[in-house]
Amino acid sequence: MTIDFPRETEIETKNEMDAVLQAGRVLMESGAEIYRIEDTMGHMAKSLGIRDFSTYVVNRGVMISGLNRSGLKESRVLATSVPSIHLGKLEEVNRLSRELAEQPNQPVSSIFQKLKTIEQKTFYRPLEDITACVIGAGSFSLALGSSWIDGTAAAISGVFVGIGMQLFSRFIHTSFLQIILSSAIAALLANILYYLGIGQHRSVIILGTLMILIPGAYFVNAIREFTQNNYYSGLALMLSGVSTCLSISVGVLAMISILPFAEQLSGMFSTPSTSWLGVSIQTFMAGLGTAAFSVLYRVPKKYFLDLGTLGAGSWLLYLLIWNNTHHEVLAILFPALLVTITSRFLAHYRRCPATVFLASSMFPLIPGMSFYRAVYFLLIGNADLGLSFLRACFLASFTIAIAVSLTQQIPSRYFVLGKKK
């Protein structure tokens, strides 16, 4: 997504209020939470000498007002484009805010130039995106308990889904149509590979491949917005995630209906291992898949080890609790608490937003896949199985919301262990 920054000749007429507004726009269009946008803009305004600053942010809109350095009251209103998750830009703007706090006397033209650089920065090349799809699809398939042959088939499908996503993003500007076509490719490749004898369970192959399309960050951010009482923005994000899951279901169902050798998906999707070797493999693959998926969210590479470790740890805890209790709430609550608490520690230590860690490493626990399966089975007329997955989706959502809310009650001072040098 491209943001229209002022031309060089126009920057001279812009002041500190415009710079703060532009930063808010970058954050909004990068998928930042409402409170994150308001907090960052407030810190930047304070650093730039804007007094009595106030801001109101809603989905696709930013409004600010304050007293400039001349003591004059100014207000700004700006409509933003549809947000897309780009945690790298979010982290860069956060760094710029800290830089302004340390060096407040920077010219406005310099701030605009830095924001423009952030917007134009290329974090990953198309080949890296495709590689992430391959590793993510194969890893998550194995993390869910599939066999090595099914994981390999999911990785092969991930190649074509990744290529398709690159092509669709260039020529198709409707997001839900991109998702429908990408999920159709996943179903096509999974059934072809299964037909050729590459793979044992087509449902697991499709599921592993579709993990790279599941809108995990939208669900996590929506839950965080609800816990902050930002119901309008939370609902908008949740609907974005729901529409993506609906698009995935339509794409898979349409392709399966077309192919003469395809069959409807079964209710068996994953088999959590009970052996230590199996649990170890699933844990490692969950961490690898989390790190690979972070590429699609444009997370800087320096955080991959943190994210992979956290993703693996949360999935290990989930498997241990589930294998010993078979209690859904406990199996999600404690891993979610691990992710939220660790994310806050890492945010202070790494000096970056907790969203960078929370949105990515929470991915193995997110309820998006359950919602996709619920919609799919409801569409094919299997109401019992559809309602069962729908129940699991809402249960996971509210459990994660409880974990996030509990962690937010802890004062920030308890998470300060030291600063990274």
Please place each PLM-identified region on the residue numbering.
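Soluble N-terminal domains of membrane-associated systems
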Residues: 1-110, 117-119
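Alpha-helical transmembrane segments and their membrane-interface boundaries
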Residues: 83-341, 345-358, 363-365, 373-421
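Short glycine/threonine-rich loop/turn motifs
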Residues: 368
